[in-house]
A protein has these predicted regions:
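Hydrophobic alpha-helical scaffolding
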Residues: 88, 139, 152-163, 184, ...
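Regulatory modules associated with amino-acid/nitrogen control
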Residues: 237, 277-327, 400, 408, ...
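Divalent metal-dependent catalytic cores for phosphoryl transfer on phosphate-bearing substrates
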Residues: 69-94, 219, 233, 434, ...
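Proline-centered turn/helix-capping motifs that create local helix->coil transitions or kinks
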Residues: 409-416, 448-455, 529
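Non-catalytic interface/linker regions that flank or bridge core catalytic/transmembrane domains
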Residues: 1-62, 69-71, 77-431
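Short, conserved secondary-structure transition motifs
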Residues: 114-124, 519-528, 719
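Alpha-helical phosphate/pyrophosphate-handling elements in metalloenzyme active cores
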Residues: 39-61, 204-219, 226, 432-474, ...
Length: 852
């Protein structure tokens, strides 16, 4: 073909593709679009094939998605060019010319050129090739060659081997996506519960059912009519969505990125409500479709399993349940049984038999159907209530039972408030799972505390949980702690009301109701205290102890808090947070067990403990008496006994040095480093230090800023490596100790800070920066709270602005939650003057302006 003809054909093809998109956008018939798009490409390729006189020389075959006539706007075109035994020079040149022309038309093609024997070898070697050819379709050329190919495909297809290979492939893909489809930007093709999981059903179906089509799933009683119709509806939903996604992205994009979610919601005519954005409502439907796909994929792959064993074990204490393939299954005689009265019996039996790893497909379908029939009569039935609580009180498979229940929509049907948060995403810059998935992750984390083989993860939590008398209380607290998300208002208070209703309905003991209610109301208190306040201050511990009241509340809240934070995102939890929570638990427990010690007594004990540590280094009290007197009494409120001992060892011979003293050490928990700064007090110490740590790639997790009675700054910084890497710590420590002295002594102004770009997530959700300033009691100290999206350079920028306003920082607690920063500072105006409201408002506006 001459260049002019190619350009004309390319223009014609582009126009036809555009018309197909226009028709789709008008009618929203994705199935027709995919077929028509495939047929358009069929005609185009056949025309090229014919013009190059390849018709009698080789066979052109469509494979994969193109083979099953599901060609999306920007999908690759998979082709097999089947040749006779070998390629001669003329045929090779023609095929090369054909592929070149296809690319010239702007089509994205993936192709292979093979003869029958080569294809047979590839089918046996690679299950991906076998799968692609399972959906092959003749386009043009030698039909005899194509018939031979179909014969080879059928001869080499061993259903059992194919099934095992595809299951392994699916498991690997799910692992790649962290076993969760409920993340913020799911891949609607590859993520668990996406189109690939629907295609898996077709591939396995084709391998074991002759002339398989989806309608046979209903005809052969693999699915009832209702589930079959929902399967078809879900398939259409995903296909329409993927077409739209390609259109707005203008490329082969299968991830529902934040940038596209609102655009898609607009195209699909979602409307915002009082408490939900249109994109959130759209994503809720996406997650519901994912949820159903995950469920139906499991059901049908179990039903279509060609290597299913006929071995059945009867269960003595149940006349309608059997064990088959290590699944708990419904006896075929009771296939049409009304299982609603026995829903919870199923899970009690599942927990009882250790060899059971899941439920059988027929039982799953029955449970899914029964979920729709749960009503108030069922919920008020004392027998059913006792069974549900029995499942939670079991020592076996609590997490697995609840996950299967949720898969079958049973939890949301039994606890309607839970049903409202199923598939609901949390757009708060740190939760990456839907609310129901997060809640189940919390329960899974609680269950991990019980396992001896996982004791190394959290030894203290393991010991506390093993000795915890009523574990079901913690599971119920986890179920309800976020149950009121998305309603507007304080979800902790609203969730507590849901607990009261559930407790009243289920006749929970008053003690259990009171503890669960308190845990739901207070589930954020411990993390807030640990991450925002100074735990070395006895007054902070005293205030927290007043809130928790007793050891039972403290232990319960500690276990729930650790499990909760770990369930938000893999990026939120770290050893720093673990240490903060552990220390708060330890200090508060000590306070509760010792009784109400006065602040003076607490400080006296702290001095005694520090002195004992120093004594092990042969440092007597007369060595550091002057140093401690110069530090003043407030110093002992600021630092722990271990920190006091360390600092005293370093400084007792340097009470008033002329040059800054910098010392660095590893943190005791093994994560991060501590940097001590001791020098004559001047302005901008904190600011210069922030800039230095930014430059060397360390983020400040916490800072204690203290001024001694003889006007020396004694500051302690806890640092985390922003980009963990292998380093020589000895060299790093020497570098910091030398370089930071120079920075602090220089009179040069620090370079203006430039914030890094916002993350896509923060940009999409337009997270509003929140800043508040409140006076601490009647003192000249003010608490500054800043909540914003986290970016490199943020702390330096805040410090720059505070320096300009003659405001000094006495304490900083830096809390990073995924992409969100929640930073708390204790600050003082110059000369400890009090700030009036105008000054406070003005400072808030200036900080917002520089952070924005």
């Amino acid at each position: 073909m001459i260049q002019k003809e190619i350009l004309s054909l390319k223009k014609e093809l582009a126009l036809n593709e555009l018309n197909l998109i226009k028709v789709f956008l008008k009618k929203r018939d994705g199935i027709s679009y995919l077929q028509n798009h495939s047929q358009l490409i069929d005609k185009t390729l056949s025309r090229l094939w014919h013009d190059l006189e390849l018709r009698n020389s080789a066979t052109l075959i469509a494979c994969g998605g193109y083979g099953r006539q599901e060609l999306f706007p920007y999908s690759d075109i998979d082709l097999l060019i089947l040749i006779p035994k070998s390629l001669n020079k003329s045929l090779s040149q023609k095929i090369e010319q054909f592929i070149s022309l296809v690319w010239d038309l702007g089509l994205r093609v993936g192709h292979s050129v093979r003869n029958i024997n080569q294809t047979k070898i590839e089918i046996k070697r690679d299950i991906t090739v076998q799968t692609n050819l399972l959906e092959s379709r003749y386009l043009n050329g030698d039909k005899v060659l194509y018939k031979n190919l179909k014969k080879i495909i059928n001869e080499t297809l061993i259903p059992a081997k194919f099934y095992q290979g595809k299951i392994k492939e699916q498991d690997h893909r799910h692992q790649k996506y962290n076993q969760s489809a409920y993340q913020l930007e799911p891949n609607i093709k590859e993520s668990p519960g996406g189109l690939r999981d629907l295609q898996m059903i077709q591939w396995v179906g084709k391998s074991c059912i002759k002339r398989f089509t989806p309608t046979k799933l209903n005809q052969k009683k693999y699915l009832d009519k209702k589930n079959y119709q929902k399967l078809i509806k879900t398939d259409i939903f995903f296909k329409n969505l993927r077409i739209l996604l390609h259109v707005i992205a203008k490329q082969n994009e299968d991830r529902l990125l934040f940038d596209y979610q609102n655009k898609l919601a607009l195209l699909l005519k979602y409307k915002k409500t009082t408490h939900s954005k249109r994109s959130e409502l759209f994503m809720k439907d996406v997650y519901e479709a994912i949820n159903f796909t995950t469920f139906i994929n499991e059901v049908l792959l179990k039903k279509l399993n060609p290597i299913e064993s006929d071995k059945i074990t009867k269960i003595t204490d149940s006349h309608f349940l059997i064990i088959k393939n290590n699944y708990l299954e419904i006896n075929s005689k009771f296939q049409n049984k009304n299982i609603k009265p026995y829903i919870f019996d199923v899970f009690m039996t599942f927990q009882k038999y250790k060899q059971l790893n899941s439920l059988g497909p027929n039982l799953l379908l029955l449970l899914g159907s029964a979920a729709n029939r749960i009503n108030d009569t069922f919920r008020k039935d004392k027998n059913q209530q006792a069974k549900f609580l029995s499942i939670l009180k079991s020592n076996e498979k609590v997490n697995r039972s609840l996950r299967i229940m949720n898969k079958c929509n049973l939890i949301g049907s039994y606890i309607p408030a839970f049903g409202k948060i199923v598939s609901q995403m949390q757009h708060d810059l740190f939760h990456i799972y839907t609310v129901d998935e997060h809640i189940l992750n919390v329960i899974q984390n609680l269950r991990r505390f019980a396992k001896d083989e996982l004791k190394h993860e959290f030894p203290d939590c393991h010991d506390l949980f093993k000795n915890y008398p009523h574990k079901h209380i913690l599971y119920l607290a986890a179920l309800f702690h976020d149950i009121a998300k998305g309603r507007g208002g304080d979800h902790s208070e609203l969730g507590a009301k849901d607990v009261h209703e559930f407790s009243k309905l289920n006749h929970l003991p008053s003690h259990d109701e009171a503890l669960i209610t308190w845990l739901v109301k207070s589930h954020l208190v411990m993390s807030h205290t640990a991450q925002k306040l100074d735990l070395s201050d006895p007054r902070v511990i005293e205030e927290f102890a007043r809130k928790v009241v007793n050891k039972e509340n403290l232990t319960s809240l500690y276990l729930l808090t650790v499990a909760d934070i770990r369930a938000t995102s893999p990026h939120v939890w770290n050893q720093w947070k673990a240490t903060l929570l552990k220390n708060l638990f330890k200090y508060t427990l000590n306070y509760l067990e010792q009784g109400n010690l006065s602040h003076e007594d607490s400080i006296a004990k702290r001095k005694e403990k520090a002195a004992l540590i120093l004594n092990t280094y042969n440092i007597r009290d007369d060595h550091y008496k002057d140093l401690w007197e110069n530090f003043g009494e407030n110093y002992f409120y600021k630092y722990t006994e271990e920190e006091i001992a360390w600092q005293t060892r370093l400084l007792f011979t340097h009470t008033a040095p002329k040059k800054p003293i910098i010392r660095v050490r590893h943190r005791s928990n093994g994560e991060g480093i501590e940097v001590l700064i001791y020098q004559k007090n001047t302005m901008h110490i904190f600011n210069k230090t922030c800039h230095f740590f930014d430059e060397i790639g360390y983020s400040i997790a916490a800072a204690k800023i203290f001024t001694t009675q003889h006007n020396y700054a004694l500051n302690l910084f806890d640092l985390l490596d922003a980009n963990p890497k292998s380093v020589s710590y000895e060299g790093l420590f020497k570098f910091i100790e030398k370089e930071l002295v120079g920075r602090l002594e220089t009179s040069k102004e620090t370079k203006p800070t430039k914030l890094s770009e916002r993350s896509r997530q923060a940009t999409h959700f337009a997270f509003d920066t929140k800043i508040s300033i409140a006076q601490v009691d009647e003192s000249p100290i003010y608490q500054l709270d800043i909540i914003t999206d986290d970016r490199n350079g943020l702390l330096s920028l805040i410090s720059d602005q505070l320096s300009k306003e003659n405001i000094s920082i006495n304490q900083a607690k830096i809390n990073t939650l995924g992409s969100r920063a929640e930073d708390t500072f204790l600050v003082a105006y110059k000369n400890n003057l009090k700030m009036n409201q105008n000054k406070i408002d003005n400072l808030v506006e200036k900080l917002k302006a520089v952070i924005a």
